[in-house]
Every structure is written in structure tokens, then in C-alpha cells.
Amino acid sequence: AHSYGGVVLHDVINNTHAHKAIEKGADGLIAVAAGAGGHAGAKSPFALIAEIRQWFDGPVALSGAIATGQGVLAALAMGADFAYIGSAFIATDEARATPEYKDAIVAGNSDDIVLSNLFTGVHGNYLAPSIKAAGLDPANLPVSDPSAMNFGGDAKKAWKDIWGCGQGIGSVSKVQTTGEFVAQLKSQFEQAKAALV
């Protein structure tokens, strides 16, 4: 990315990884905190941002259960330069997710999110309905041995229909266009900011 003038932001789940990412040449960081969809961190967003900001003043995004304008404002208040929203955008018309995936997000809440390392060998957050649809019990998933995982990319991904998702989905009430969702975020952000002053 640097060769064409691009900016590199590196996902990190803790302060150690943040240091390594900057040492290796990343321009900024995406602090992936607890509650994020897919491969999530376990750190509180408060702790993660505070630790990073003690030594790094470059661009930092915060990710993890952010699905509202209020969440964006909170991320900025904690010291992030911007918020990174993922799961809520899956439930937009433009997303290439299946209708079932989008509907599960709209119908779900944080209780429907399961943390497991079974599917990739790395802990991540997934939607319980997709785990059930695969014939597994979300409450009794075995622990994976990361050393036995095939990361070569040759085999078909058996977990392709296991849907990564963050804990912020309880704030997603409908499938809408990206433009409508962004307008909603802006309105919520402005209302939340005005309420603080």
C-alpha cells in the first residue's frame, strides 16, 4: 500500500501488537476491542485505547460493538480518531451478505453472539443461529487446536456459513441502504453530542 501512497492501518487486539505494528511500518492502528465481530480482541475499549494513546499519537480507529452514533461519539471521547463499524453495515442493502445473514443481525442482540476458536483456530465472535444451522450447539462448542488448522487456503472453508458478528447488533433494527444507515449514525451522533453540552 505504501508503494502507491496508501495508508496502512493495522488491526491490533492489545498494546503489544500495537507496538509491533507501528515498528513494522503501519501508519495507524485499528484497536479491535471486546465485542467486535469476527476475530475480536478481549480487551475493554477503555483500556485498549488508553494504553495505545500513552505512546502513540497517530491515527487510531476503535472497533468493537459500535453500531450507533452514540458509540461513534464514545469512541472519539475515549481517544480514537474515528470509529470502525462492521457488523451493522452487513445489514445494508449494498452488502453482499445473504438475506438470512442480514435478517439474523436484525433479529439478534448481544446474547446471540458466541465467542469461539473452533472455526479458524483464533477466537472470534459468531452468530449463534448460524452455528445452530451448521448442526452445532453454540453453548457446547469444542475448543480448537490452532496447530491443527489448515491456513493454506486449499481446502474449502467449512466455516463459510458461520457468520461473524459483533455484540452491537442489538441496535440494528432493520435492513436499510448504506446511505440511510450513515444518515442515522450522523443524526444519533449529533443528538448525543448536543445532549452533553
Question: What spans do the regions from the language model cover?
Answer:
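Short low-polarity hydrophobic stretches
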Residues: 2-5, 29, 177
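Glycine/Thr-rich beta-alpha phosphate-binding loop at enzyme active sites
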Residues: 11-50, 92, 96-98
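Conserved short-loop catalytic and cofactor-binding motifs
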Residues: 9, 36-40, 63, 89, ...
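Short, structured coil segments at secondary-structure junctions
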Residues: 4-5, 24-25, 56, 78-79
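Conserved active-site-proximal phosphate/metal-binding subdomains
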Residues: 45-61, 67-197
